């Protein structure tokens, strides 16, 4: 009996002492009806989720906790300059679901949240790094404001942070060109009856930063200082000033003399390093953005 007790004690000690070295469970990324191809040299799973085209890229060797980056729109724009392939090479998964030109509307956020739930259920980290390119800034920041505890970081690139600037062209400084057709779509999707209602709307990223700061969401924004489509002075620079006042973490990278294009950086290493630092750890594997939503 004493021999059995000693063996049991030693077994408990070994498991307690070395359990962290045991291989972690791998994400289940085999989706119903999926097809597979290569994305920048890595395996990509392509599938349909709630009638929306979606995909997830697997790294060759995943980082502990299975962190991931999530591009909200324009996943094929300036890809090599916007850090995603480099993050996958560093062990991130990378995901996308096509919700169209929906400007972070409530209906789009519902689909994004359900997709997020599904990927967490399948084994990815609960807090991804969001990538918001151009109008994707509205998508990324609005999603993070709705679910701040479910986002680790945001990378915004020439990112729209105030719809009055773009597509409205009606921010205080009126520095941006605006887009009348997109402005009309934006108002319709957000249930805003007219210009007056849209100008008074309080759902812009510049106005919804407090929840992100409280949740510790780290922000990095890359801006072209000569951007006259999404002027930094009406968008990312406002976010930076307000986020710092709230005690949030934000880094700005300026591109002197550069306009709205090209997005990204000749060498995106600073963005990659920032996202690894703030979103590449073991990760929070708590439930998805809406507890119990599946």
In which residue ranges do the predicted regions lie?
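Short beta-strand element of the alpha/beta-hydrolase
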Residues: 64-74
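Short amphipathic alpha-helix adjacent to the substrate-entry channel of hydrolases
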Residues: 78-95
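Hydrolase active-site cap/lid region
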Residues: 142-194
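The feature captures the conserved acid-bearing segment of alpha/beta-hydrolase catalytic domains
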Residues: 173-237, 241-244
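C-terminal catalytic histidine-bearing segment of alpha/beta-hydrolase fold enzymes
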Residues: 229, 233-292
